[in-house]
A protein has these predicted regions:
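Domain-level signature for proteins that mediate thiol-based redox and metal-cofactor handling
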Residues: 1-103
């Protein structure tokens, strides 16, 4: 059975096409949960985007789905808007530095 860390590692390969940073480093992936669905290992991934009007939403969601399938048999990507993404709170220190956000 896959672990949350394995799914996050797979998702780390997905980049925001505008920021050129990993969706995991940006803190866009909020949660990964597991369940058995029809005898298959299934993951539910809660993630958000940098903004509700993100022009690359479909591209990012599809890339996240494909990447997660490298770790689990079945996955559903849930697009959530709560909590609202804030790079000062959700992004890693390295991602904040790359975006020029200095605390």
């Amino acid at each position: 059975m896959a672990t949350k860390d394995e799914v996050l590692t797979a998702l780390d390969d997905v980049e925001d096409p505008e920021l050129k940073l990993s969706i995991v480093e940006l803190g866009l992936v909020y949660d990964v949960r597991f369940e058995s669905k029809e005898g298959k290992e299934h993951a539910e991934v809660d993630m958000t985007l940098t903004s509700p009007g993100c022009p690359a939403a479909a591209e990012i969601m599809a890339a996240a789905h494909r990447a997660a399938l490298n770790a689990v048999e079945s996955v559903h990507i849930n697009l959530v808007w709560s909590p609202r993404w804030d790079p000062k709170i959700h992004a890693s220190e390295d991602a904040r530095m790359d975006m020029g956000i200095w605390d």
